[in-house]
Regions:
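His-Asp phosphorelay/catalytic-motif detector in bacterial-type signaling
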Residues: 61-63, 87-94
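Two-component/phosphorelay signaling modules centered on CheY-like receiver
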Residues: 26-45
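Hydrophobic/aromatic residues positioned on beta-strands within the core alpha/beta folds
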Residues: 97-98
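Acidic, metal-coordinating helix/loop segments flanking the phosphotransfer/catalytic sites
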Residues: 33, 46-64
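Non-catalytic signal-transmission and effector/linker regions of two-component phosphorelay proteins
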Residues: 1-20, 27, 85, 113, ...
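Short amphipathic alpha-helix used as the core "switch/output" element in two-component signaling
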Residues: 78-90
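Acidic catalytic/metal-coordinating carboxylates
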Residues: 49, 75-79
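Active-site residues of response regulator receiver
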Residues: 68-70
Length: 145
C-alpha cells in the first residue's frame, strides 16, 4: 500500500500577497524579505522607521505586517498598530516581533499575534498562512504546533 503523498506547496493555505516589514535591524529586515519572497510572497516592503511605515500604510494597505515593536526611532511600534486598528475589520494581520513579549500590553497583543525573538522564518511563514483570527490573542513562543 503506497504511503500518503507528502504535503505539497499547492496544498498549503496561501500566503499574503503583500507584506510590510517594519524592522530597524537591516540584516534582519533583508533576511525576512528574502525568506518571504522565497516562500512566495509577491510584494515585500521593508521600512526601518515608524515614519516610513506610517507613510507606506497611507500609500497602500498590506495584507500583513511584521512589526518589530522596539524600533530605534521611537521606543515602540504602537503608533503603527493604532493606525492599523483604525482600518477596521479588513485591517492587515499584524505579527508583533519582540525579544520581550511580556512587555506588550494585552490590548495591543489582541490586535495581532506576538512572536518572540529569536524565531525561525518557517514559524513566521506558517503563522502568515493561518487564517486571520479576530478578537483572539495568539501568543507564539517558539514553534507553531
Amino acid at each position: 500500500m503506497p504511503d500518503s503523498p507528502a504535503t505539497t506547496k499547492t496544498d498549503l493555505p496561501p500566503l499574503p500577497d503583500r507584506v510590510l516589514i517594519v524592522e530597524d535591524d537591516a540584516i534582519i529586515g533583508l533576511a525576512l524579505e528574502d525568506a518571504l519572497a522565497g516562500a512566495g510572497v509577491r510584494n515585500v516592503e521593508i521600512c526601518t522607521t515608524t515614519e516610513q511605515a506610517l507613510d507606506a500604510l497611507r500609500r497602500e494597505r498590506p495584507d500583513a505586517i511584521v512589526l518589530d515593536v522596539h524600533l530605534a526611532d521611537r521606543d515602540d511600534g504602537w503608533a503603527i498598530a493604532e493606525l492599523v486598528k483604525t482600518l477596521g475589520p479588513d485591517s492587515p494581520r499584524i505579527v508583533f516581533s519582540t525579544g520581550a513579549p511580556q512587555d506588550i500590553p494585552e490590548e495591543v497583543a489582541e490586535m495581532g499575534c506576538v512572536l518572540a525573538k529569536p524565531y525561525d522564518f518557517e514559524t513566521l511563514i506558517d503563522l502568515l498562512r493561518e487564517p486571520k483570527r479576530r478578537g483572539i490573542i495568539s501568543r507564539l513562543r517558539g514553534r507553531l504546533r
